[in-house]
Amino acid sequence: MPLHPNQDFLNQYFSETWTGDIASYQYSGFKLLEHIRPSDRVIDVGCGDNPFKGKIPNLVGVDPANSKADVMLPIEDYETDEKFDIAFCLGSINFGTHEIIEGQIAKIVSLLTPCGRIFWRCNPGRKDHNNKLCEEIDFYPWTFELLEDYARQFGFKVVDARMDRNSRNERLYCEWQRIFSE
């Protein structure tokens, strides 16, 4: 599975320049805690400064650039025998080509239980981080249609999708639930 060709630049940008504001998102911020049961095992993909740490008992934060992560690796390189009930992909699966995005989704899906769910916050291709370095980032142009197509491709259904705003930007929020075949 290919890594982003500018992974080193992305790691530097997200460890030194970017700052998150998870608390201000209406759906994909701390409101997600309402979807978590105490027994749920959760992986936070691209967890940044690991804001859910201490709020979710069985959480593993994976991030290639932030030292507050439980595991400092790109998701493509993360290996474990553990399976997770829920994956958070909150602004992390936003960079690169269709091939890179598809590979990252395949990896995340492989880490989930048969009843797994994925919560998404996706950037619809906007370079709105309010700094010049952001112009060098290759944002994937997410749409609700792409989220629906990928959900279907990987055996999930979309159970919620809406715009999610904070004081700085507008993002796509989406929840996937695995489809059971009988």
Where do the protein language model's features map onto the residues?
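Helix-to-beta-strand junctions that scaffold the AdoMet/dcAdoMet cofactor pocket
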Residues: 37, 96-98, 112-114
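A conserved beta-strand element that flanks and buttresses the S-adenosyl-L-methionine
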Residues: 88
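Short catalytic micro-motifs in class I SAM-dependent methyltransferases
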Residues: 91-95
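A short glycine-rich, Lys/Arg-flanked "PGG" loop and its adjoining helix->strand segment in the class I
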Residues: 102-114
